[in-house]
Amino acid sequence: MTNIPEIPYKAVVNIENIVATVTLDQNLDLYAMERSVPNVEYDPDQFPGLIFRLEAPKVTSLIFKSGKMVVTGAKSTDELIKAVKRIIKTLKRYGMNLTGKPKIQIQNIVASANLHVIVNLDKAAFLLENNMYEPEQFPGLIYRMEDPRVVLLIFSSGKMVITGAKREEEVHKAVKKIFDKLVELDCVKPFEEEELEF
């Protein structure tokens, strides 16, 4: 049995963006919205959706005449729900007759993480399955995790980007799982301040 180094898990995870679709189950008059609702943009010759920007929380919604919306920019599920409620409330305040409850479905969560370790990407590329690492093309290792089903871009600095999650818990699970796997494969070492090169 090999000696697995004792490296503490000190990862910091940040949700950067949540993209969700919202179904309103009714057709919408985007021209009426453009005339009534302030601070929206609608130019059907350029793009078929109406652009609705919120300042707090800072999200953008693309609203289509089919009653579908794409909401992007939220940093948490709670913020996403708050944004959708605020959009619906604003549309109703300006005379839009919206019936029914919106159905929200998260399509993608993008997160960043810092493992606070140095990752040996050459070794990880050799030992991990489902990965792609071509340092001449891109400095990070692309790892496709099966459970949860996410893609991780892992850098030698211990920083990473996670995409494809549908729930925030999946992001945290994926980061912990890849950390444990990298430790098990002896692909990480503690981050030392003096190792920084300027």
From Swiss-Prot:
Membrane-spanning ranges: none
GO biological process: DNA-templated transcription initiation
Keywords (A to Z) from UniProt: DNA-binding, Repeat, Transcription, Transcription regulation
Described function: General factor that plays a role in the activation of archaeal genes transcribed by RNA polymerase. Binds specifically to the TATA box promoter element which lies close to the position of transcription initiation.
Full protein name: TATA-box-binding protein
GO MF assignments: DNA binding; DNA-binding transcription factor activity
PROSITE patterns: TFIID
HAMAP family: TATA_bind_prot_arch
